[in-house]
Structure formats: structure tokens, C-alpha cells
């Protein structure tokens, strides 16, 4: 009596087994990063504030930290308004990755609340008015999350932005 497997040609059976193993390995390698970075980001931000002797920060429910270093005038920016701002962005190790000074101090302009900028900017600039200056400490979930938009910004990076609102329309 022949065994069940002997009914199949061995090379076909072996090829099928190899195919299934390779498929399983490839799908395991493509798993999405589901790590929650909230606690890590919170610890990094609070340590950064302490280590750099920074004061005046208000933590927002989203985890964004905002310190208004110079008050402006008028009403805060509202969703749908065009905001113009000067800025410098850096990682927590002090490396500047972008700045409006790289563009002859030409302010960046965006429509608030439309997703044209990272979520930390949409939330942070809604707390600012014309002429105000602030420091935004942005957790990775409100920045680029698991993406690395450039070699200067690693995935899951917590970011600092020094910003100045030059106009609101």
C-alpha cells in the first residue's frame, strides 16, 4: 500500500512546500510597526525640557507641548485661515533639518487645519496669533510617525520647532 504523500510527485510537493515557506517569511518581514511611541515620546519631551532648562510649556491633550516665548496680537489662527511663519526645525539632538533661513527668511505659508503640514503644526499654530513666537515640541505621532521624510529626520522622531507667526489671513 502506498502512503498518501507517495501519490504526489516529490519534486512538486517539495516545490510547493518551499513556496509556502518563502511566502510565510516574506509576509512576516512586511509586518507593520504597531509599537505605541506615546510613552516614549512623553518621556523624551519631559527629559528634554528638564535637561535644557526650558520653561513655560503647556502640554496639550494630544501630547504636543507649546511654549509661547513672545505673545502676539489679535485673535489666534483659525482653521481655514492662511498662516505665514518663520521656523527652524531640529531633532532633539540639536541637528537642524530645516529652516526658513535656508530660503532667505521667506515665511512658509499654509492653510491651517487642512493637513498641508504635520499635525503638530496644525495644532500648535491654532494656539498662536500674529507676531507670536513659540517653541513646539512635537511627539512622533503628530510629526512624521514611522516615516523618515529625509536622512535628517529618523522614523519616530520627536521634533522641536521654533516658530514665529508673521501673518494670518
Kindly give the residue locations of the regions a language model identified:
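Cross-family detector of peptidyl-prolyl cis-trans isomerase
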Residues: 2-169
